[in-house]
Amino acid sequence: LLGELVTKHGTTVWLVNTGWSGGPAGVSDRMPIAYTRAMIAAALDGGLASVPTTPDPVFGVFVPERCPGVPSEILQPRSAWKDPEAYDEQARRLAEMFRQNFEPIAGLVPAEVREAGPRVG
């Protein structure tokens, strides 16, 4: 239903990280509220509409390459981590957890939803 409404009304959907950035909990910092506000403002005022995006190789979401008021490295999670290989491992773990959690209902959703999930491997 959500997908139908998004398509019907031509809505753009943005996912905003308001949690940890730069590493796992306990090692990194929370996303600064000023950056969160800047991302939301840019999404609402159309400031992200023409910005180039890069697809995340694991999660498949398209990440803006820049956003007014936000350092570019913050937008790319792997670049924000001090240890990019540790990010890769955590991303793989999270993708696998998602896959396992989704498995019981996978047959109940359309193929396009199943195919939009994280790429585990």
Can you say where each PLM-predicted feature lies in the sequence?
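Conserved NTP phosphate-binding and transfer environment spanning the P-loop NTPase/kinase superfamily
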Residues: 1-121
